[in-house]
């Protein structure tokens, strides 16, 4: 379909980090070489089960951190530039002080390991349907105030700001050179559903025009997630075709 690169999701039976370590990484590298398609980033599943570093006992937190360290290692082996992490729901009894203390500890450790491997750790804010405390650009700003590490950077999935009536473009101003990646998809009010670009309510063409105006030159991927799992090839093709058309209309070649 003409992709420049892909962002690889990891969860069984699909690029799960322990399976990669057990030998599946060789198949991933074979496919990268066969199709001449680099893996830009690796996104291991850890928002709910069985891994979520924001909730549970210390043993459970440690297990999640070790899993993500392994994910960083596997990303490095496949030639990826980053691993994506998103702080999920921290439980309903935790205070903000407790949540922030736990998150700072987690990202500090993962960031130090990312720096050791010389691979970026990209942190993503989620929708309020997915996380009960890390959902806005300001949360990323606060995290970067607490964790000073050039290998820890941020991104914008454009659905979270849209469903919260937050400015998408504010991410660029607030994060500055820490604004390193984007998930560009469409969405609708009242839902965290990710839709094919041009088939929801987000003014993507106008957003692309503004991105061109400010000179955004980092990376972006189309994250369709679970809404189209019945026919992923059909909808992946439609998504990239729609995106090319929107980019052309915005004057991006």
Language-model features, listed with the residues they occupy:
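Active-site-proximal loop/turn and secondary-structure-junction residues that shape catalytic pockets
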Residues: 10-12, 45-48, 88-91, 125-129, ...
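Short linear motifs at secondary-structure transitions and domain/linker junctions
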Residues: 13-14, 96-97, 129-130, 156-159, ...
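Active-site acidic/histidine proton-transfer and metal-coordination neighborhood
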Residues: 51-153, 163-165, 253
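Histidine-acidic metal/acid-base catalytic patches
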Residues: 1-2, 26-29, 33, 79, ...
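Glycine/Thr-rich phosphate-binding loops of Rossmann-like dinucleotide-binding domains
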Residues: 16, 93, 131, 192, ...
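Hydrophobic faces of well-ordered beta-strands that scaffold small-molecule active sites
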Residues: 6-8, 39-44, 83-85, 121-123, ...
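N-terminal pre-domain/capping segments
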Residues: 1-80, 108, 115, 149, ...
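Short, flexible segments with low predicted structural confidence
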Residues: 3-4, 46-48, 85-86, 114, ...
């Amino acid at each position: 379909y003409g992709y420049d690169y892909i962002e690889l999701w990891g969860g069984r039976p699909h690029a799960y980090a322990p399976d990669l370590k057990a030998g599946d990484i060789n198949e991933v590298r074979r496919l990268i070489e066969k199709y001449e398609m680099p893996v830009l980033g690796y996104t291991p599943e850890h928002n709910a089960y069985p891994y979520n570093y924001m909730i549970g006992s210390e043993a459970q937190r440690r297990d999640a951190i070790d899993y993500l360290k392994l994910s960083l290692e596997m990303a490095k082996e496949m030639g990826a530039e980053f691993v994506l992490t998103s702080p999920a729901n921290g439980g309903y009894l935790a205070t903000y002080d407790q949540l922030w203390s736990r998150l700072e500890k987690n990202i500090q450790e993962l960031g130090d390991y990312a720096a050791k491997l010389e691979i970026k750790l990209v942190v993503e804010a989620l929708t309020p349907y997915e996380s009960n405390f890390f959902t806005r650009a300001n949360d990323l700003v606060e995290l970067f105030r607490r964790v000073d590490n050039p290998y820890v950077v941020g991104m914008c999935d454009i659905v979270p700001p849209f469903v919260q009536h937050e400015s998408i473009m504010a991410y660029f101003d607030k994060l500055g050179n820490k604004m390193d990646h984007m998930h560009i998809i469409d969405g609708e009010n009242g839902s965290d559903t990710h839709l094919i670009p041009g088939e929801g309510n987000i003014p993507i063409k106008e957003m692309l025009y503004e991105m061109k105006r400010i000179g955004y030159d980092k990376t972006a991927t189309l994250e369709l997630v679970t809404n189209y799992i019945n026919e992923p090839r059909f909808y992946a093709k439609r998504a990239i075709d729609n995106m090319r058309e929107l980019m052309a209309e915005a004057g991006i070649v």
